[in-house]
Amino acid sequence: MITLYEAAIKTLITHRKQILKHPDSREILLALGLYWDKTHILLKCQECGKISLTGKHSTKCININCLLILAIKKKNKRIVDTLIGMGADVKYIHFLNNKTKLSYNQLSMLKSNPQISLKEFHAICYILYGRLPKKIKQGMRLCKTLAGLCGELLCAFFAP
């Protein structure tokens, strides 16, 4: 038997476009428990990698990227951080309109990580670009390729 909470989450994912148009969508999300901390009831399913209420595979598993898009549209950085930590795809992060701030520790970790994917690299560069002063941005417009732009961004942030 499905609980009321499970039914509400399933409805939210299925009808997220209509719910986001509703003027009281923030209260709806709060009532459904989507403003959570790291100890929230939602767990990553071990079998399919989606979000599950129990951590076990079932037909009610929810795509983590649907929750990520919803959190980004609501500009809730805490949920975005949690979902990315749980394995959500970072390619949607540019929807945050450069409001995501990376800490010094996160930047240092990225600098020393040779395994970072191209998708993650582009998302990070997009975030960093939003934090640069105007003079550096004007100089970066001279870059002809995305690789050159990414290189300039990383040099600007990781130079000693």
Swiss-Prot record:
Return the similarity comment: Belongs to the asfivirus MGF 300 family.
Question: What is its biological role?
Answer: Plays a role in virus cell tropism, and may be required for efficient virus replication in macrophages.
Would you tell me the protein name for this molecule? Answer: Protein MGF 300-2R
Lineage of the species this protein comes from: Viruses, Varidnaviria, Bamfordvirae, Nucleocytoviricota, Pokkesviricetes
